[in-house]
Amino acid sequence: NTLYKEQAHIIRSIAAEGNGAVFLGRCAEIVLAGQPEVYSFFICADDAYRTRRAGTHYGGMSLKQLNEIEEKRSNYYAFYTGKKWGDPQNFDLVINTSRIQLEQAADLIIDYVNRVQGE
């Protein structure tokens, strides 16, 4: 619980600086809920894509290992937020990267933020 509180404090402090930041995980969309100009995205992929990517980016982890990590993330998220990890209602946009390239996903995120900001 102390670690979560410290992480939340750091996330809020960095966000308050107003220089823009990207937070990966750590329940940041919940920690920063209600703050202006906060956008949250959930990136997912099917098992085939996750397995292929794990072979090139995560030391060749097996799907079983990836699922164990995902279960830990899910439990962490549920414990600290009371919400279901990956629930689309908790995010502005959910992107399945097994259907589009990562660069296209980044473009979608940029386009989303620009549209919300009225550009």
Task: Please give the residue ranges for each predicted region.
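Short, amphipathic alpha-helical "lid/cap" segments that border enzyme active or binding sites
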Residues: A8, L102-I110
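C-terminal helical "lid" subdomain and adjoining coupling/linker elements of P-loop NTPases
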Residues: V116-E119
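Small-molecule kinase domains that catalyze NTP-dependent phosphoryl transfer to phosphate-bearing small molecules
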Residues: G60-E103
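Short, well-ordered beta-strand core segments
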Residues: A21, V38-S40, V94
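Short, polar loop motifs at secondary-structure junctions
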Residues: G25-I30
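ATP-dependent small-molecule kinase phosphotransfer cores
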Residues: N1-G20
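Short, well-ordered alpha-helix to beta-strand connector turns
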Residues: G18, Q35-E37, F91
